Amino acid sequence: MEDLVDELYGVDEQGSSSAAARKRRLTAEQVRALERSFEEEKRKLEPERKSELARRLGIAPRQVAVWFQNRRARWKTKQLELDFDRLRAAHDELLAGRAALAADNESLRSQVILLTEKLQANGKSPSPSPAPAEQTAVPAAPESAKSFQLEEGRCLYDAAGSTTTTNGGGGGVAMPAARVAAARAASNDSPESYFAGARSPPSSSEDDCGGAGSDDDYPSSSVLLPVDATLVGDAFEHAVAATVAADEEAPLNSWEWFWN
């Protein structure tokens, strides 16, 4: 405590033992003036500045020099303490950051180990079979498509009585109603249906096979067909011929042709 007071008031320790009676304490006003001067310049005290302060404060130049020397030493010590505190705080901050990084590293390492185990487990498990590919329908050949369309062709009747037949190319060909009727009669009706209500022409005794004539007069009587069968065959041939000639001209009705 006494050393601190001596430093504050500029007491020379070397001369304290030999000249204790000559010790002179600095007043509070002198200490404040020296503090203000030290705050203005913390560098080494120049001789001119030292002489001026000693003359203005009424103390010896040596006492001013000793006070500045002690005050500069305390200031340096305080700066070292402040620097040490700053370094310690920075060190503690770095240690905390290192601990956080170590924790993050450990967490990432555990995640990597877990993911590696999962990948290994998935690699050992059988892989799911791929879904069967959808079978694409193979388009039919042009020839088969045309034949199919020809087989599936149908007749569409319009209001005028004509008929449209679809061909293989998708277009329509108009057909007369008479031709269609004749074709239907030839394909669907039996030959006997043409003569359902007709009467056979009268036959004479000469035409009968059981007449008075001899076998020489009728050489071909054994191969003659009945009259009804002959007429039926002629009617069927006429129906086919009427179907073929329907495009050129409109034929007479099959019944009218037969009776005419």
Curated annotation (Swiss-Prot):
DNA-binding positions: 19-79
Classification via InterPro entries: HD, HDZip_class_I_plant, Homeobox_CS, Homeodomain-like_sf, HTH_motif, Leu_zip_homeo
Gene3D superfamilies noted in UniProt: Homeodomain-like (1.10.10.60)
Superkingdom, natural source: Eukaryota
SUPFAM superfamilies: Homeodomain-like (SSF46689)
Keywords for the protein's UniProt record, in alphabetical order: DNA-binding, Homeobox, Nucleus, Transcription, Transcription regulation
Protein name: Homeobox-leucine zipper protein HOX25
Organism: Oryza sativa subsp. indica (Rice)
Taxonomic classification: Eukaryota, Viridiplantae, Streptophyta, Embryophyta, Tracheophyta
